[in-house]
Regions:
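Acyl-donor (CoA/ACP) binding surface of acyl/acetyltransferases
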Residues: 1-21, 29, 62, 69-184
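Conserved catalytic core of Hanks-type protein kinase domains
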Residues: 26
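Short helix-loop boundary/capping segments at the starts of domains
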Residues: 29-32, 56
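Conserved GNAT-fold acetyl-CoA-binding loop/helix
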Residues: 31-51
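Juxtamembrane/interface motifs at transmembrane-helix termini
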Residues: 42-46, 54-56, 94-96
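A short helix-loop-beta-strand connector motif used in the catalytic cores of GNAT acetyltransferases and
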Residues: 52-64
Length: 184
């Protein structure tokens, strides 16, 4: 099987129909789902509908994240709401397997995807949204260079509680400066 992108420890390839059951299984962890800003649990049928939408439109690109050593799916990542006239997209990244948390797999994935987004797809702007009480997620995105641009007050509701939704962005020129500084 060919892979779209790879780095030292991970491979990225487009989501395939055969991946949906495993993704639904990984996404069944309610605590992780809340951190991701989605309403969970996700059923296999909902995953199937998402997959079909990905196949029918050109406004989203979705990949599974695979650990090279075990050849197992550990998460998913992709661009959505791609709008090429403005060269913008929203970005999503989720390491669903807790065994891979805080070990650099998220950063490795983000680096591959940002390089792809800015250098291959020629995006000018990539945006993300982070649930406000996900302090670890906010620190992660800031460490990669994303900046806060606004807050949707009580923009996320889960388990009877509202949380703010923090909007963040990264522009191509900031990405290039950050990457060049890291190479020296």
């Amino acid at each position: 099987m060919s892979y779209f992108m790879e780095s030292e420890r991970i491979k990225l390839r487009p989501v395939q129909k055969d991946d949906l059951k495993k993704l639904a299984e990984l996404m069944s962890d309610r605590e992780i789902g809340v951190l991701s800003g989605e309403v969970y649990p996700i059923t296999e049928r909902e995953m199937d509908n998402f997959y079909d939408r990905c196949q029918k439109t050109d406004d989203r690109i979705w990949f599974v994240i695979i650990d090279k050593e075990t050849n197992s799916i550990i998460g998913e990542t992709g661009f959505l709401r791609i709008f090429m006239p403005w060269r913008t997209a929203d970005y999503s990244l989720m390491i669903w397997n807790r065994n891979y948390w805080a070990k650099g797999y998220g950063k490795e994935t983000a680096n591959l995807m940002l390089e792809y987004g800015f250098n291959s797809l020629n995006f000018h702007r990539i945006a993300i949204g982070v649930v406000g009480n996900n302090e670890r997620g906010l620190r992660f995105w800031k460490s990669i260079g994303f900046k806060e641009e606004g807050k949707q007050k009580d923009g996320f509701f889960n388990n009877g509680e509202y949380s703010d939704f923090i909007m963040m962005y990264l522009l191509d020129e900031k990405y290039r400066v950050t990457r060049n500084n890291n190479k020296t």
